């Protein structure tokens, strides 16, 4: 069991305890398991420290915010690697379907934590930093900004009572710092324009890429995915940031 840092219990109690939480994202969330009980994932520590009523995981390893030119929405398909159809928009559609059909409770809080694969595999998303109305499959934007806006719009329209939080990727060794910063800046810009809280993990989070290089990374197992200590630090950071915003 990891000790609480000062202020964590209060922040969690104010904004997360007893709430239903939905999780959308990539492997950084997925590695905690569907039951949020695997120690190397931040969700396991978040569950123990914040005590939400429920946590439903829609995240998939390999997922990106950004749609590819050939992205199709297929809620029946399952991918846990980088794939044109492994995108956050599809996860959001699954969540909406589950809530509308009564499979899941309407979440009080939706945490959307992704962007690592957008930075790492930007070449696989050719429209990532383009502007304008480029679309995939005739309807989905193929830019990062457009993709973030589309996901948030879908959730806001169908789950208007759910609070959304966008979380930028943590620093990592798998992609240049400039790529992580650029992806994070786009997510931040869209979130701010929509009035949605953004947690800048790349800038303010506990993971420092310089400390993760070499033979003995401190908070990750491979320069990107957290080890149990890193997962606990990340969970504490998220709880503090969520609580701080709630008190403003």
Provide a role label for each language-model segment.
Residues 1-4:
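Bacterial N-terminal signal peptides
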Residues 9-10:
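Cleavable N-terminal signal peptides
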Residues 18-22, 30-128, 133:
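Conserved SGNH/GDSL esterase-like catalytic core that processes O-acyl groups on lipids
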Residues 24-27, 58-63, 112-117, 167-171, ...:
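Active-site-proximal beta-strand/loop segments in catalytic clefts of secreted hydrolases
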Residues 34, 73, 169-248:
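Catalytic His-Asp segment of secreted/periplasmic serine-dependent ester chemistry enzymes
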Residues 47, 51, 115, 153-160, ...:
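Sec-exported extracytoplasmic/periplasmic mature domains
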Residues 113-117, 149-184:
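Active-site segments of SGNH/GDSL-like serine hydrolases
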Residues 117-142, 170-182:
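Serine-dependent acyl-ester chemistry module
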């Amino acid at each position: 069991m990891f000790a609480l840092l000062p202020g964590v219990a209060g922040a969690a109690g104010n904004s997360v305890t007893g709430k239903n939480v939905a999780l959308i994202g990539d492997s950084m969330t997925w590695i905690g398991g569907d039951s949020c009980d695997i120690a190397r994932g931040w969700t396991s520590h978040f569950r123990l420290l914040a005590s939400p009523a429920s946590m439903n995981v829609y995240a998939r390893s390999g997922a990106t915010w950004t749609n590819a030119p050939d992205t199709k929405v297929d809620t029946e398909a399952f991918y846990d690697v980088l794939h044109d159809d492994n995108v956050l928009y599809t996860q959001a559609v699954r969540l909406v379907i589950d809530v509308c059909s009564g499979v899941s409770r309407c979440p009080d809080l939706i945490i959307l934590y992704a962007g690592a694969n957008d930075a790492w595999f930007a070449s696989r998303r050719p429209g990532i930093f383009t502007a304008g109305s480029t679309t995939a499959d005739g309807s989905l934007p193929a830019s990062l900004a457009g993709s973030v806006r589309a996901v948030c719009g879908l959730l806001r329209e169908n789950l208007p009572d759910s609070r959304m939080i966008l979380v930028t990727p943590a620093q990592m060794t798998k992609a240049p710092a400039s790529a992580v910063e650029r992806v994070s800046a786009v997510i931040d810009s869209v979130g701010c324009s929509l009035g949605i809280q953004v947690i800048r993990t790349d800038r303010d989070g506990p993971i420092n890429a310089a400390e993760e290089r070499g033979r003995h990374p401190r908070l990750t197992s491979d320069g990107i995915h957290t080890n149990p200590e890193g997962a606990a630090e990340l969970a504490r950071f998220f709880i503090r940031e969520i609580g701080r915003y709630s008190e403003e």
